[in-house]
């Protein structure tokens, strides 16, 4: 049996998929662990505390019941930045989707922490109003 480890990790949700009636599976890009697959139980319920912290591109500090190479469980999260300015602009969302796919692919091949730092810096610049097409 794989031992469970409760960890706190800072990351950004790069993908979310529905799971059953009320839950979501999230892919979170992190500095220390690369990309983590996480089950957010009940996150689609209206009154769930995980509802607002389980949206795509949410930058947060996540408390996770971690299982290496398996689906982990999201216990709670504290939002650092929801990147609301990006979510209001379809062009910025498109660029961020592309950047997320690219970063996810690169991090699977090389879990260098600098990749996460560059990704986060790019998102912060886009959030501040930098034109991503430049």
Write out the residue ranges for each language-model feature.
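Non-catalytic alpha-helical scaffolds and adjoining flexible linkers that form interface surfaces
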Residues: 1-24, 29-134
């Amino acid at each position: 049996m794989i031992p469970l480890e409760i960890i706190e990790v800072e990351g950004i949700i790069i993908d979310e998929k529905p799971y059953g009636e009320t839950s979501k599976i999230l892919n979170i890009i992190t500095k220390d662990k690369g990309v983590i697959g996480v089950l957010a139980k009940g996150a689609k319920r209206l009154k769930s505390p995980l509802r607002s912290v389980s949206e795509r591109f949410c930058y947060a500090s996540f408390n996770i019941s971690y299982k290496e190479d398996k689906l982990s469980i999201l216990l709670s999260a504290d939002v650092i930045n929801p990147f609301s300015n990006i979510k209001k602009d379809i062009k910025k969302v498109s660029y961020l989707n592309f950047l997320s796919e690219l970063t996810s692919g690169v991090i699977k091949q090389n879990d260098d922490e600098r990749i996460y730092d560059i990704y986060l810096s790019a998102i912060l610049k886009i959030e501040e109003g930098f034109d991503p097409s430049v």
